[in-house]
Amino acid sequence: MDAQFTLELTQLLFQSIAPDTTQITEATRALETKYLKEPGSLLSLFHIMGTCENPQVRQLAAIEARKLCHKYWSSVDADVQNQIRSNLLDITLKEPESIVRHAFGRVIAALAKLDLPEGKWNELSAFLVQATMDQNDSIREMAVYVLYSIAETVDLDNKLLLDFVNLFSQTITDSSRTVRVTSVQGLGAIAEVLESDDKKLLHAYRATLPGMLLVLQDVVQVGDVDASKQVFDVFNTFLIASGAIISKALGNIIEIITGIANSKQVDDEIRCMALSFIISCIRFKSRKLQALKLGKPLVLTLMEVATEETTDDIDEDCPARLALRSIDLLSTHLSPSQVFYPMFEAACAFSQSPQASYRKAALLSIGVAVEGSSESVAGNLPNIFPIIINGLCDNDMDVRQAALLALSQIAVEIPTEVSKHHAQLLPLVFELMSTQGVKVGKSACNCIDALLEGLDKSEISGYLPMLMERLVGLLEFSDTPDIKSCVAAAIGSAAFAAQDDFIPYFERTMASLSQCLHTTDDDEGYELRGTVMDTLGAIANAVGKQAFLPYTEQLIQLAYEGIQIDHSRLRECSFCFYAVLARVYKEEFAPFLEHIVPALFKSIDQDESDILSERIGAPTAEEISQLLDSVETNEEENDEELEKAMGVNSAIAMEKEIAADALGEICMYVGAPFTPYLEPTVEKLVACTTHFYEGVRKSALSSLWRCATTYYKVCNVPQWQPGLPLKVPVPDTVKNIFEAVRKCTFDTLEEEYEKTVATDILRNFAESIKTCGPVVLGDDYEKLCEVVMEVLQKQHIVQAGDVFDDDFEEEDIVSNEEVDDTEQDALLIDSACDVVIALAVALGGSFADSFKVFYPQIVKYYMSKNGNERAMAVACVGEVAGGIESAITPFTRDVFSLFMAALEDSEGEVRSNAAYSMGLLCQFSTEDLSSEYLNILQKLQPFFTQEVFRTALDNAIGCISRLILHNQNAIPVDQVLPIVFSKLPLKEDYLENAPLYHMILALYRQQNPCLVQHLGELIPVFASVLTGSPEQLNDELRSELLSMVKEIAPQYESVVSNYPQLVALLQ
């Protein structure tokens, strides 16, 4: 060892801890560029560790020595190595400062990692085991900490792992709390590498869990926040380690940790740790939780926690806020039977409480649960609305705000159902927006925003004058960017609902919004500007391209400037604005592509790690690794740095999601002029399909399918015909793009673990097949059928079980039959049925052989207790009948029996779908079912006298129309038609207009007396469908119906004259 070098190195280490920034910078540079690059620096550092009197320098020397061990230890002479090993153990035992002892312990572990595999330092284990039994607490603590460091650092075989488990199982009961906690950490390190195939090791490990729980309860009871965090970190490790470790103990673990979360005697910071564990448990062990039927006790406990006060800072964790987050996740990951229904029962009781905190918790629980249980919420709206209305009228401000938040969330998730109650809800919310303080007023404005978006043009018209006067007034006179943002968003929703009825308010609104585009250069200003860009897009869509044209170029330039600003939210809103303008201007948007598409590419190309270092001055990837390894440094600061890193990554990921989605939208609406950008767009999007964030994957895949479908359309391929091989030639370029999209789609599906992504993939596949026909399938028809069958059998990887639980013992496996489906599960299966339907449409009669395989799997869902699944099964079989047409004949008797039973189902949606499907079966099957028509009519009769389901009446009319078209002689037309005509026009399911008006046209050509005598009273119906929304009729049917009306118009001139729009059409 060079004495002079060691002296200089010591001086530099002293300089590194000086209070002078300049000295620190100079010392760090010298250490990195010169001194620590010398092989002899390791020996000098060991010397400084043992001799320096300053504990900070000793600690720093140990940190640097640990980093250098793997570089220089092998070059040290064997005799010197032995001397260092002995001396290192000695100085570690004698070190008085615990943080320095830990640093020394890490050095011992680093050397052990190098020595033990080579059969060196064999005496270390015996020394440490002996030290764990020493009378001196500090020696035991040191020994266990070194053992923990070795367990964390060294690759141990199963025999050594078992020795460590057995040793920690003894030290976990030590009289020293520090020893006990460190023992738990050591066991946590072992859990990360433990594999379940060694049963002896697994059972020994499981035997330590009760002891670990006792340590957790102890540190929680004494309020030791740091120790609690260390132990909770270990329990969090269990959730992503071998599933077999805690599978048998999970119920007991949840019970204890839930108790901690719910105890007001426990420090809030520790309770937040417990709730964070519950959140992770829901994410990673949802099927196990469901199999253990823990959903109900969990949600009830969490609702109790939700009654507590929340902190003012919405970004700050507190027990109540985390409890609501947990309820949100529970509703998504567990079935409604275990979460929503127990939660709603408790919410009903809470809402009657004299304590405002309970009434507030009831409303907030309903609000957070709706995203994962929207179908269940929709089915219970008659019982939910009274709770919300009472909340809106509550005398407590916090309860009123909670009611607004709940109503907003429900309106976002199920807008159609909520919009039916606008007359009851909107006046209450208007009043709160006008008369309450800023806090409630802001929530009321957000609620208005959500409610308006669900209204149609006719529903909003009565509110528009008063609403726009109030909103524009608030926008012009409020000084608060936050309030302005809420108001601007509400204006956007009003425009979205009003469509061209918004034109009278257009100029004043644009003038007011324009002022908000020149805001302060801070987060609030950028947020406001982003929201205004969203609103301007909604207005452009409402008023149309001609009215918006004077503003277009300037706003596109402003949006482009927004993209250059370092603010993800503003960039996202600019991307959305471009996508909306593409929808409005279509091919006329082409001149702007040369600037906009590269900007979208730039966003997608962002490297999260580069941006991380650039934006927050964060360390490099290697330095982050060192931060994670260096537990002897300030862990709290490290956590903050990593949180900042994750925050930046999340913001960039969400920006990429929006950019990917905007590319697909722009491609779809601009069409042919986008073709020069198509190839690089596909390349960028394909790269995004492997992104870590599911939102990016989903947007990228959706946009890829839109790009492929759009290219098919712009190539003007003749209308496809059902069947494979292709009957209509398709250019190779079209085949190639579909092949590329299919490949990354199947690659993603092979390892996708997010149900929402898998669901979206199958929906896009189905839509593309229906639009573009069999060319979409290429050579992958069998592969697609395999994926769909896996999903229908609940055997796809995304349905296979909890994340990380691929190595349970056989008795621990949770089968799909043991748990009810979540609504997310049901959506995935529904999307698989969509693909089956699409294949039937694209392949026609040739799909019949495949349908023989699919049919039993689909019909199994009709046996489900879940009404939605029964409805799905009936609709799927009916749609397939419509796709394969006469090829349904061999299935007729089975399918007919299914539909007849479904027409009497307890659920209205099932009966509605059965009516639709029965019509298709009777229309296309070549087996004569006319003898059953009267039985079918009998089962349809209640549809005309009762409220069965939203679409039930329309489906019944469609069914009857098909029966008449197929064999009118089997129907008492003179009795049936007056009833059908009295219920027109159709209001809910416009698809049924096709059989209805084909039937009317057919009877008219025959001059059927029953039809002819009702033609006069049908004029208002014809006026409604011919002058109403275009989606009511396809072009061909519209033309035929218009011709018929022109023929009969002279006979009914006095009636026709009451409908000016119809008169204009007839001229």
Curated annotation (Swiss-Prot):
What family does this belong to?
Belongs to the importin beta family.
HEAT repeat locations = 159-196, 379-416, 420-457, 591-633, 890-927, 1013-1050
Q: Which PROSITE patterns match?
A: HEAT_REPEAT, IMPORTIN_B_NT
Coiled-coil regions listed in the entry: none
Look up keyword Repeat and say if it applies: yes
The biological process GO terms on file are: protein import into nucleus
| Source species | Schizosaccharomyces pombe (strain 972 / ATCC 24843)
Q: Where in the cell is it found?
A: Cytoplasm; Nucleus; Nucleus envelope
Going by the entry's taxonomy, the superkingdom of the source organism is recorded as Eukaryota
Domain Importin N-terminal as annotated: residue spans: 27-94
SMART domains (UniProt xref): IBN_N
- Function recorded in the entry: Required for nuclear protein import, its predominant substrate seems to be ribosomal proteins. Binds to nucleoporins and the GTP-bound form of gsp1 (Ran).
Keywords noted in UniProt: Cytoplasm, Nucleus, Protein transport, Repeat, Transport
Q: Which GO terms describe its cellular component?
A: cytoplasm; cytosol; nuclear envelope; nuclear periphery; nucleus
Which protein, by its recorded name, is this?
Probable importin subunit beta-4
Spell out the molecular function terms from Gene Ontology.
nuclear import signal receptor activity; nuclear localization sequence binding; small GTPase binding
- The main place the protein resides is cytoplasm
